Amino acid sequence: MNTIQVIIFAVVLVLTVTVGQADEDSAETSLLRKLEEAEAAMFGQYLEESKNSREKRCIGESVPCDKDDPRCCREYECLKPTGYGWWYASYYCYRKKSG
């Protein structure tokens, strides 16, 4: 009789735990969905507006660039090398002069 009671108790315990977890998972999922909807409502328009104002891919410092179509980042400009790089035929992105 004791063994049957232990088995029944174990089965009831397992069922209680699995059903309880299912309820918690569905509650977490619905809460996550609500938070995502609220975030989309609050920040969706802002993200869409700022997406196009972001700087496109650009070339960093000391990287070859095209004189006619420079793709240097804002703080750089496409210049012909001077000094040690005078023998190179192409232009390079260099930091803009601050003066």
From Swiss-Prot:
Disulfide bond annotation, renumbered to this chain: 58-73, 65-78, 72-93
Annotated positions of the Serine amide modification: 98
Tissue specificity comment: Expressed by the venom gland.
Pro-sequence residue ranges: 23-57
Signal peptide (residue range): 1-22
Superkingdom as given in the UniProt entry: Eukaryota
Entry's Gene Ontology cellular component terms: extracellular region
InterPro entries in alphabetical order: Toxin_22
Main subcellular location of this protein, as a coarse class: secreted
GO molecular function terms attached to this record: sodium channel inhibitor activity; toxin activity
Subcellular compartments: Secreted
Entry keyword Secreted: yes
UniProt entry keywords in alphabetical sequence: Amidation, Cleavage on pair of basic residues, Disulfide bond, Ion channel impairing toxin, Knottin, Neurotoxin, Secreted, Signal, Toxin, Voltage-gated sodium channel impairing toxin
A Pfam family matched in the record: Toxin_22
UniProt note: domains: The presence of a 'disulfide through disulfide knot' structurally defines this protein as a knottin.
Function, in words: Has minor, but significant effects on the Para/tipE insect sodium channel.
More details: Negative results: has no effect of mammalian sodium channels Nav1.2/SCN2A, Nav1.4/SCN4A, Nav1.5/SCN5A, Nav1.6/SCN8A and potassium channels Kv1.3/KCNA3 and Shaker IR.
Family: Belongs to the neurotoxin 14 (magi-1) family. 08 (Ltx-4) subfamily.
Descriptive protein name: Omega-theraphotoxin-Bs2a
Lineage: Eukaryota, Metazoa, Ecdysozoa, Arthropoda, Chelicerata
